[in-house]
Structures are given as structure tokens and as C-alpha cells.
């Protein structure tokens, strides 16, 4: 399953607020479609599927990518669900979004893909790059790159920058001072349900 490129509000009407996907709010609270307003009791599978879809659409990744992250999270020590969220939060496109360099995760991915972002002084155009403590994320030192980031910083997608990201707005750079804290994950998600969804699939 490839990355979703369709109407974003249609997704948020079905799954709820996804700050990484869009900053627009859905006007109608019921799901899209002819029978969107009908209330049906959902199965446990449907609930797990919905949590999985929240994660996939918020971070803008394909099903195949998410499966890889689940496998990697499972191989690490500690809670698989927490490990999964940390892996997604540490993606370079998400870090740029959390810093305010991009309006959404797709917008931040474009910044990265177009070579506007550096990691430890080197241009890094891989959105899935795993940032780690000690890395310095910065906007490339040219006029076009700086203008893009400065415009986005005036109206950031999220109000608060996580404390482990030490942002210097004047230099358009940030140092990752510590590991990602589960408490600062922006999306409302039950990661345990996501792990349960993949328990028999991966």
C-alpha cells in the first residue's frame, strides 16, 4: 500500500485529529460516506485497524514502512509500542515538523527531499533518517531555504517544541539533547492496539 495522497480532511473525519497530516479541522464530525452518520458497534479488529491507520496517516508512511518499523521496534528492548512511537518520532521529517520548520509532516518531507535540511552540517535528503541524541538539525545556509523555514516558524503546526529539541530560532537549528519522551508524542494513540493488530501479521 503506497503513501496516501488523497483528500486529508476525509481522513481526519474518519480517524480524528492528525496534527502531522493536516492543520485543518474537519467541519463534520461523522465519518465520510453515505452511511457515515450511522452508529454501529465496532469489532475489536476494527478498533485496532483504526489505531493503526491513525499512525500510518499521521506520519505519512506506507503500510510496508510501518511493518518494517514494527519489526524493528519488536527487536529492541522495552515496550514494543513505545519503541514504535519513538522510531516514528525520530524520523527526520517528523523532527523538522516538531521544530516548526514545516507546516505538516508532508510539508517537512518536501523540505528534506529538496535538500533544505542538514544533519550535523551535511545536507540530508532522506526523510526517514533516524535522528538521535547529539544530532544537530539545521536549515541549509542559503536564502531560499531560510525563507521557507522562517515563514513556517511564524505559524507552526504545533505550539510547543518538545524539550529534547533545543531550538535556536535565530540560527534555524536545533540540537537533540536527549531521547524522545513518550509524553511528548502529539497524536492521541493507543500504541498497544497497533502492536496487537500486527501480532499475527508480522
Curated annotation (Swiss-Prot):
GO terms for molecular function: rRNA binding; structural constituent of ribosome. Disulfide bonds: none annotated. SUPFAM superfamilies: Alpha-L RNA-binding motif. GO terms for cellular component: small ribosomal subunit. Residues 90-152 form the S4 RNA-binding domain. NCBIfam families: PRK05327.1 (NF003717), rpsD_bact (TIGR01017). Part of the 30S ribosomal subunit. Contacts protein S5. The interaction surface between S4 and S5 is involved in control of translational fidelity. This is Small ribosomal subunit protein uS4. It comes from Prochlorococcus marinus (strain NATL2A).
